[in-house]
Amino acid sequence: MDIVSLWRQVENPLSYAVPFFFVLVAIEAVMLRADERREGKTGYSMIDTRTSLLMGSGALMFMLLIKIVTLFLFALVWTHLAPWHIPAGTWWSWILLFVVVDLTWYFNHRFSHRVRIGWAAHQAHHSSEHFNLGTALRQKWNPWSEAIFWLPLPFLGFEPWTIYVAFGFNLIYQFFSHTETIGRLPRPIEVIFNTPSHHRVHHGSDAEYLDKNYGGILIIWDRMFGTFQQELHTPTYRLTTPVNTHNVFKLQYREYGNIIADVKQAPRWLDRLGYIFAPPGWKPRRLREAEKQATNSTAEGKITATQ
């Protein structure tokens, strides 16, 4: 394969979409300001939106770096290891690719919520207390897990450049799911596709909304794998532990620092691995039991004091 010509073929649809994103963010902000005057509500904060735009700009650069690294790896896999090559010039191959890319997005997204080292990268996207088109641009600066979950695609025969194109369109679709200005859509759409209603649930920190609705374009994966949740009420948009900062570097890397601190104080290797690869919030059994005993003792003390 001619790597130079391959590189020239790799176009990122996001590069063309970004100017339209900015225009749509401005339009939505004006609409929500008008709602604020009528209802006393607003979906935008100037400093919050500025933070999201800074994070989105940085994410584009880091995505370019990931593309440079993975392009050559994927080209080698596709050229030397793929048992067959899927033609890129047919309509059915693109439909198949879009479905497969969306499925890999689902598993990568689920990994990013259920494995702490993955959550350390992804949590920045969930750090806003607002939910709007600007929030869609609040992207992570370390998209390493995508490269891992994409690796099977060139092995399955998809040309590397087509993977980047399909992923770009996947992200463009998801941009429009970050809004409160659109209610529920007709049921056939809600059943098949990831809609603003479904994605509002995903961004909620309410107990019933946690770790739900991972789909990118299609919501059928969540229905198939048991992670679907209907929107029941307006979600609480934030991390379960609010970050209280707009510093983009803290938002991007704070959880890595928390992991390092937990690993350093852990006495056993098993506990250290748990702090890295277990779900966010995991603690060793001895700490959970100690906290439970402390809670029970506090409750007993309150009962005694009231007698």
Q: Where does each model-flagged region fall?
A:
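Short, strongly hydrophobic alpha-helical membrane anchors
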Residues: 1-11
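Membrane-interface helix-loop junction between the first two transmembrane segments
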Residues: 25-50
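Membrane-embedded catalytic scaffold of the fatty acid hydroxylase/desaturase
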Residues: 57-66, 88-237
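Juxtamembrane/interfacial segments at transmembrane-helix boundaries in multi-pass membrane proteins
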Residues: 69-95
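Cytosolic-facing loops and C-terminal tails of multi-pass membrane proteins
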Residues: 234-307
